[in-house]
């Protein structure tokens, strides 16, 4: 299978840089897969699980929003946060969800509350995926 260059960058680190076969990205407008020769695009990334395929093996990385750009050079994802599932502190992630739920009680109805609910929903989907697929 043809490969292309993929960079996953967060403010803290370069989480991944190398040749890959495929990357599945959690997009705001819907998830999308990128293969070698993909048409150029720019898309917003929602909190979710990004899947990198190398040599037929899949590496799962949690991203918490960001921006993806496909160009002739490959795919670059600028993520707000990027953490490999292998490195995830599941207890801290669960506490973060509990804190988000608690903070919802303090939000006034409106746009900010809607955003907080949507973000919490994304986090819960990630948590469900981790527990339902045995990634713990």
Swiss-Prot record:
Main location: membrane
Molecular function GO terms recorded: ATP binding; proton-transporting ATP synthase activity, rotational mechanism
Membrane topology: Peripheral membrane protein
GO cellular component, one term: proton-transporting ATP synthase complex
Subcellular location as annotated: Cell inner membrane
Disulfide feature: none
Keyword Oxidoreductase tagged: no
Transmembrane segments: none
Keywords carried by this UniProt record: ATP synthesis, Cell inner membrane, Cell membrane, CF(1), Hydrogen ion transport, Ion transport, Membrane, Transport
InterPro entries, A to Z: ATP_synth_F1_dsu/esu, ATP_synth_F1_dsu/esu_N, ATPsynth_dsu/esu_N
Function: Produces ATP from ADP in the presence of a proton gradient across the membrane.
HAMAP family: ATP_synth_epsil_bac
Subunit description: F-type ATPases have 2 components, CF(1) - the catalytic core - and CF(0) - the membrane proton channel. CF(1) has five subunits: alpha(3), beta(3), gamma(1), delta(1), epsilon(1). CF(0) has three main subunits: a, b and c.
Similarity-based family: Belongs to the ATPase epsilon chain family.
Protein name: ATP synthase epsilon chain
Species: Afipia carboxidovorans (strain ATCC 49405 / DSM 1227 / KCTC 32145 / OM5) (Oligotropha carboxidovorans)
Gene: atpC
């Amino acid at each position: 299978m043809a490969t292309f260059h993929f960079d996953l960058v967060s403010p803290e680190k370069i989480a991944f840089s190398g040749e890959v076969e495929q990357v599945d990205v959690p997009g705001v407008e819907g998830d999308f897969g990128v293969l070698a020769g993909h048409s150029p695009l720019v898309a917003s990334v929602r909190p979710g699980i990004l899947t990198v395929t190398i040599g037929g093996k899949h590496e799962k990385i949690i991203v918490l929003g960001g921006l993806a750009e496909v160009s002739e050079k490959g795919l670059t994802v600028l993520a707000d946060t990027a953490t490999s599932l292998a490195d995830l502190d599941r207890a801290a992630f669960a506490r973060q969800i509990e804190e988000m739920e608690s903070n919802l009680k303090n939000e006034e109805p409106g746009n900010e509350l809607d955003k907080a609910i949507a973000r919490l929903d994304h986090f819960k989907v990630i948590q469900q995926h981790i527990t339902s697929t045995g990634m713990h």
